[in-house]
């Protein structure tokens, strides 16, 4: 109904016995681009479970992406997952949700860097404002985290996401956009365009 919507990342029960049939059904709609499960709400080993990985193994067949939505302590499981499926496109959502208001956690830093070594993994620059204490922040709080993401993934595998409407818990939509735009001012217009749209078009086949 709305032509500005170019793609949807939806939920499919990847542990279902008929997962192939379900994926075929949704993939028949060209607007369906990928799958995401709220793995952050699962046990830390969720992404290494056989039934979960069986479902993920079916995604590439339908040219579907998998968004990894996790907390920092689940990064080791994500590493094991992406290593097992080198032909599957993965997107790390919300930079794995580090606590922005605290000094950078070394485990988060090391594991994100390790994850970036896999060229089939991209990172969504999103969800950061809601990872601040009491939703109080200044722009400078995010710089060390964004610096690490850019130095790890490079400018071809980072894509911006507003995390709307969840971002509204912490601030307004305009502030999220301004925050990212201000940070990206250190880069060329070409790189800025990549992060704000071009990369997403390529990664999600929009």
Spans of features found by a protein language model:
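Tryptophan-centric aromatic hotspots in well-structured domains and transmembrane helices
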Residues: 11, 66, 108-112, 137, ...
């Amino acid at each position: 109904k709305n032509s500005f919507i170019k793609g949807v990342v939806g939920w499919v029960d990847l542990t279902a016995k008929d997962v192939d049939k379900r994926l075929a059904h949704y993939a028949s709609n060209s607007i369906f681009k990928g799958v995401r499960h709220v793995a952050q709400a699962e046990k830390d080993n969720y992404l290494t479970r056989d039934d979960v990985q069986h479902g993920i193994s079916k995604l590439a067949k339908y040219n579907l992406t998998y968004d990894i939505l996790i907390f920092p302590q689940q990064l080791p499981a994500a590493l094991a997952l992406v290593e097992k499926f080198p032909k599957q496109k993965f997107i790390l959502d919300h930079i794995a949700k580090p606590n922005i208001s605290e000094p950078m956690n070394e485990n988060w830093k090391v594991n994100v860097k390790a994850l970036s070594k896999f060229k089939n993994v991209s990172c969504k620059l999103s969800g950061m404002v809601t990872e601040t204490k009491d939703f109080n922040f200044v722009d400078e709080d995010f710089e060390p985290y964004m610096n690490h993401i850019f130095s790890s993934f490079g400018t071809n595998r980072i894509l911006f996401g507003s995390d709307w409407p969840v971002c509204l818990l912490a601030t307004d939509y305009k502030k999220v956009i301004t925050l990212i735009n201000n940070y990206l001012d250190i880069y060329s217009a070409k790189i800025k365009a990549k992060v704000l749209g071009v990369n997403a078009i390529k990664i999600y086949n929009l």
